[in-house]
């Protein structure tokens, strides 16, 4: 499945096929599943690369994709992990010191592995015939409620993709997952988390954190910027689909709606994390103060929200913060005051 894409905000042209080999398709529980191998060797578009994978990165993909599924995050899934018996040379730290590692193959499954880049490549080549064939195929097998024989159908297709992309990213923000390399060739057309490369999980709550060392300078794919990048990538997909629609406004309306929906869904997600099951006019302020406070000192995101479920009264808030803050023996007074104010607001909000 040849694709192109935008990498770190720049058009990179044809990229390859992700070292992936599609084996077959099966039907299970009235759903179609594609079975794919990653790391099995050269592929039609692997160019000069060996197409191999190593055990280290394969274990990361296997474990994380399954963890994400059980955390309720839309994702591709891992079926199996196998050693190949080969030794594969890789420069792990990109510092000019390559070393041999154990080779491995991951078998993964998903309803589809189509990416934004699969559509971009045909648009870039002005190959509208194959672009239309691919879009019609995608609609027929993955969005069957859409009529693909009209421009309105293509507009609805883009709307579905936008909604699913936003849903996926909201889940990422919920669990503190940072993809690390949100290029358009790594964006699933079905809104599934795909390509577990330099991903990571937040430890301390930090909107500016990225696990990708090659992105350390600009931090384009940092945690707090993932929703914006999702929108940017959708702009590129809209550009690719435009020749089939020939109207900019419907696409622009969908992109603008993404911004509106993000604010709504982000609020709902944070309300859920805080155990707030009704709406209140002050919830946005409560959440903003919480996020500001979480940045005051290195505070473990997972530990904080886990212990917050045990919150009963103001005295218990000190125990929560002592356990969640990394340097709990050296907490400034201003820090305690701000958290005390927040827990007071939170306590009153729980009673509403």
Listing of model-derived features with the role each one plays in the protein:
Residues 128, 147-162, 227:
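Short acidic-aromatic active-site loops that bind/stabilize oxyanions
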Residues 1-2, 216-352:
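Regulatory N- and C-terminal appendages and interdomain linkers associated
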Residues 78-83, 183-186, 252-256:
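Beta-strand segments within the central parallel beta-sheet cores of soluble alpha/beta enzyme folds
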Residues 140, 144-148, 167, 171-174, ...:
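Conserved helix-loop functional segments at active or binding sites
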Residues 93-96, 100, 174-179, 183-243:
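Catalytic activation segment of kinase domains across protein kinase-like and atypical kinase folds
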Residues 161-172, 269:
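Phosphate/ATP-binding catalytic cores across multiple sugar-kinase/actin-like superfamilies
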Residues 1-151, 190-194, 221, 233-234, ...:
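Conserved ATP-binding subdomain of kinase catalytic cores across diverse folds
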Residues 29, 70-76, 145, 171-182, ...:
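Secondary-structure transition/capping motifs at alpha-helix termini
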């Amino acid at each position: 499945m040849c694709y192109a894409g935008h990498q770190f905000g720049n058009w990179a042209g044809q990229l390859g096929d992700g070292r992936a080999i599609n084996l077959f398709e099966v039907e299970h529980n009235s759903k179609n599943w594609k079975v794919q191998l990653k790391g099995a060797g050269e592929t039609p578009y692997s160019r000069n690369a060996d197409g191999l994978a190593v055990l280290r990165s394969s274990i990361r993909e296997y474990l994380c994709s399954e963890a994400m599924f059980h955390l309720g995050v839309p994702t591709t899934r891992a079926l199996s992990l196998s050693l190949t018996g080969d030794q594969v040379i890789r420069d792990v730290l990109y510092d000019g010191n390559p070393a041999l590692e154990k080779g491995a193959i991951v078998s993964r499954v998903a309803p589809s592995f189509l990416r934004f880049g699969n559509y971009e490549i045909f648009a870039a080549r002005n190959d509208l015939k194959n672009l239309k064939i691919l879009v019609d195929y995608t609609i027929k097998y993955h969005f069957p409620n859409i009529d693909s024989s009209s421009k309105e159908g293509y507009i609805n297709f883009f709307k579905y993709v936008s909604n699913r992309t936003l849903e996926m990213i909201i889940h990422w923000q919920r669990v503190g997952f940072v993809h690390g390399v949100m290029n358009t060739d790594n964006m699933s057309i079905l809104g599934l988390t795909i390509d577990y490369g330099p991903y990571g999980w937040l430890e301390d709550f930090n909107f500016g954190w990225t696990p990708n060392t090659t992105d350390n300078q600009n931090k384009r794919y940092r945690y707090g910027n993932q929703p914006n990048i999702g929108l940017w990538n959708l702009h590129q997909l809209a550009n690719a689909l435009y020749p089939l629609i020939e109207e900019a406004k419907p696409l622009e309306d969908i992109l603008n709606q993404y911004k509106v929906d993000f604010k709504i869904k982000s609020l709902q997600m944070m309300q859920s994390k805080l155990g707030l099951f009704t709406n209140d006019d002050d919830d946005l302020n409560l959440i903003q103060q919480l996020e500001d406070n979480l940045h005051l000192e290195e505070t473990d995101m997972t530990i904080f929200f886990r212990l917050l479920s045990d919150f009963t009264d103001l005295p218990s808030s000190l125990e929560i913060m002592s356990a969640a803050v990394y340097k709990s023996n050296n907490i400034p007074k201003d820090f305690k005051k701000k958290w005390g104010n927040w827990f007071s607001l939170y306590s009153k909000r729980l009673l509403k």
